[in-house]
Amino acid sequence: MSVVGIDLGFQSCYVAVARAGGIETIANEYSDRCTPACVSFGPKNRSVGAAAKSQVISNAKNTVQGFKRFHGRAFSDPFVEAEKSNLAYDIVQLPTGLTGIKVTYMEEERNFTTEQVTAMLLSKLKETAESVLKKPVVDCVVSVPSFYTDAERRSVMDATQIAGLNCLRLMNETTAVALAYGIYKQDLPALEEKPRNVVFVDMGHSAYQVSVCAFNRGKLKVLATAFDTTLGGRKFDEVLVNHFCEEFGKKYKLDIKSKVRALLRLSQECEKLKKLMSANASDLPLSIECFMNDIDVSGTMNRGKFLEMCDDLLARVEPPLRSILDQSKLKKEDIYAVEIVGGATRIPAVKEKISKFFGKELSTTLNADEAVTRGCALQCAILSPAFKVREFSITDVVPYPISLRWNSPAEEGSSDCEVFPKNHAAPFSKVLTFYRKEPFTLEAYYSSPQDLPYPDPAIAQFSVQKVTPQSDGSSSKVKVKVRVNVHGIFSVSSAALVEVHKSEESEEPMETDQNAKEEEKMQVDQEEPHTEEQQPQTPAENKAESEEMETSQAGSKDKKMDQPPQAKKAKVKTSTVDLPIESQLLWQLDREMLGLYTENEGKMIMQDKLEKERNDAKNAVEEYVYEMRDKLSGEYEKFVSEDDRNNFTLKLEDTENWLYEDGEDQPKQVYVDKLAELRTLGQPIKTRFQESEERPKLFEELGKQIQQYMKVISSFKNKEDQYEHLDAADMTKVEKSTNEAMEWMNSKLNLQNKQSLTADPVVKTKEIEAKIKELTNICSPIISKPKPKVEPPKEEPKHAEQNGPVDGQGDNPGTQAAEHGADTAVPSDGDKKLPEMDID
């Protein structure tokens, strides 16, 4: 079973796998561990990763990058509107209202969803992992920003499904970094001791995230998270791009922003310049040849000037740092270390700001680029039964408060309740109790829209179906389980109606109105921490809730506490009936569309595979043409007649011309046939060359064998001690075989020497190898027969007592046996104790 962690970044992606030796970040086909988050569409196939990155300028309109932030967002979303101006490709509104990506693929215009494009990237990363692991990859853990909302997380989950992956967990990027940091630490405080608080700062290409985590031995708990969703490396790039657009506009009279390709080239150069300035404080040049209208442009920039231009960006570094301390109620002195990851944290001014805020040196023990993917791979290993990993519990948080709203018959309007406050532990489940006579709907939403980097606070609507009143017409008790799962996605996971069965009829006063007023009842399911914080109810409500919960579990015993003492109570039994729930999720792909996209992805993968095979076949023909043309005038020259060489050279030239004309776009089989046709002419020449190279070596080996056996025959005839044990008949056989081999070799050598190099050889290397094997099989067993061993005469023992017991020792065997028994008894007891020691 494969264990894979995927860091799905805005600009680049990383894949890590768990192996017996630990976690390893794997390289792609370009021997690069970083795969660009880029997909390019062509007339025949798609290019993904590094191959697509190389087409950003040449195929700008059909090369998609920076699509990560379109997940779960409508076309009318303000963020999408703001991004339009930065994109070289077109985005469109899909029939569902979501953002689509418009490209030309297979010679026709196509609109792809963000999920589909992300699935293409995931398929590539999956293929990379499979090529390294040599087995199928299905289970994985994928990283997402900690600020992703429910809709965005569901969208990424759909993308993993389209790519044929089983995502075991969507892991927050800062939590993955914390796991990669903590799981290897041997000096963490014990569970009963004060935890070690560590801040993790991740500034990538598009966003800035901060979290503070508490570590104990074998335990990680996220205390708080904060973020700036638009502050990242690309913002610093934009500062440089805008500066040089203005400078070159004045200096060279160029309107750079009107030309997409020019702007993309400038963006690439500015990114390189930014990285150089991180290591260099001096003036650095920026030069681009034939930039626009065949004009070469150049400019300079230094770190000091760059930082002045970035003052407003650098001012945004501190607020999230201050926010996590406020949320977690920690002081700067309580922070043990500050770990930084992400490409943009390499900017000296960013590091300086963070270090100055906390008043301590920053820690860089983690790989800034690969920490997230390593954490994801570790999480996948923890979740996978195939790996035994040190126990390490991870408690994440809910980034935004989540509330439920429902229609309240008692209040003749709507009621709401905050189910999961901000920074509530996750994953987590709670049970709410409602009293209803008919189906009802729960509306989930984020209750703090001002903190939400998303325009719509709605999450979903959940309709609880088939709710019926009790047999006496009173409201039924409905228990609804709500959950934030391991992916950070909220759901109403189940609903159950509690049926009351009475053993005898009796009229009892029903407190319908009171029950209606106490519709919302909540209890924590399974997990104990945060119970008091997570139930903001009055003591009276808590008491009513506990009594009500006990009623559902203990039956009639507690019912007496709720009813007036004068009313005689019937014997009551309860049972639960699961209720169906209909979900209406915000911007969620329906199952039918998901199935269609999965099928389309499979077809596109097959098309890419066929196109690759076609190109490989074409390249094989071209490669063969160049190889043979060079060798015909080189090492193969002596092995082909002049006429044949001229004819073959002409054929090769015709094939080369055909490749660039009529043969430029042919089916795979045409190239296969063309290569076979060329090889019928070229292979005999190649064979003659190879035979000529190998034949002398094999004849030399055969000659050495013959010489060796002749030497043995001579020694045998001279009756040397080494061979006197050999049988004369056998040696005659050896002599005969050796003489025959010598005659065969001399005959073939003479014939071959008379043969022209341009003709096929008289004797082939396979025949010589067979003759060597034949001679060895006959002669070697005979001459290597060992001499018979001569055993020395046995000597009489001088002392009989050394060979056994003597007179008077008749009882010794018993004694020895007893001693032996005593000796063996001790290990026996030890053996019995061994398992206990192992268990301890």
Curated annotation (Swiss-Prot):
> Where does it sit, as one GO cellular component term?
extracellular exosome
State the conditions that upregulate or repress this gene. Answer: Up-regulated in neuronal cells upon ischemia.
Protein name in the entry: Heat shock 70 kDa protein 4
Report the gene name.
Hspa4
**Where do the segments described as Disordered lie?**
500-575, 781-840
Instruction: State the Gene Ontology BP annotations.
Output: chaperone-mediated protein complex assembly; kidney development; negative regulation of apoptotic process; negative regulation of gene expression; neuron apoptotic process; positive regulation of angiogenesis; protein folding; protein insertion into mitochondrial outer membrane
Q: Please tell me in which tissues this protein is expressed.
A: Ubiquitous. Highly expressed in testis.
Q: Which UniProt keywords apply?
A: Acetylation, ATP-binding, Cytoplasm, Methylation, Nucleotide-binding, Phosphoprotein, Stress response
Single GO molecular-function term? ATP binding
